[in-house]
């Protein structure tokens, strides 16, 4: 389970994701949103770093999820997922959003997963571990 934020902008992050990761982001972000919004009370993921980083920021996560769905549809792919409700512009962004080391770690992870595809963006991050945010 993972959300990918190579950039502070949700839209910019969505636009750079490859087909495989963008498709999964819609599903995984929705699953995380269900957990942090107390809709799905599963013990399996509640302490996962990709979940804990979004606690207290369900509106921001809904915005992220909707942005992934929007980009998916913009690319012409079939989408059966519903947009999530959110309180724009009233919500607060998570405090880690915009921290350079966070976005560098995501870029590094994406480069590791698909160097040919993500190399086109000119990212130069070394092989970094993802930073766990809680």
PLM regions and their residue ranges:
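Phosphate/adenylate-binding glycine loop and adjacent helical scaffold
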Residues: 1-38
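Conserved small/polar residues in nucleotide/adenosyl-binding loops
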Residues: 131-133
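Conserved, mostly hydrophobic/aromatic
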Residues: 48
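Catalytic phosphate/metal-binding cores of nucleic-acid and nucleotide-processing enzymes, i.e., regions
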Residues: 26-36, 62-65, 72, 78-102, ...
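Polybasic (Lys/Arg-rich)
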Residues: 43
């Amino acid at each position: 389970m993972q959300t990918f934020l190579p950039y502070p902008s949700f839209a910019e992050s969505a636009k750079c994701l490859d087909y495989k990761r963008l498709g999964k982001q819609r599903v995984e972000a929705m699953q995380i949103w269900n957990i942090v919004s107390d809709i799905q009370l599963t013990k399996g993921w509640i302490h996962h770093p990709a979940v804990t980083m979004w606690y207290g920021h369900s509106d921001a996560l809904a915005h992220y999820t909707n942005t992934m769905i929007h980009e998916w549809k913009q690319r012409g792919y079939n989408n059966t997922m519903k947009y999530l409700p959110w309180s724009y512009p009233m919500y607060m962004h998570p405090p880690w959003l915009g921290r350079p080391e966070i976005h560098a770690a995501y870029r590094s992870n994406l480069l590791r997963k698909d160097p040919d595809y993500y190399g086109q963006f000119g990212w130069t991050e070394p092989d970094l571990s993802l930073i766990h945010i809680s």
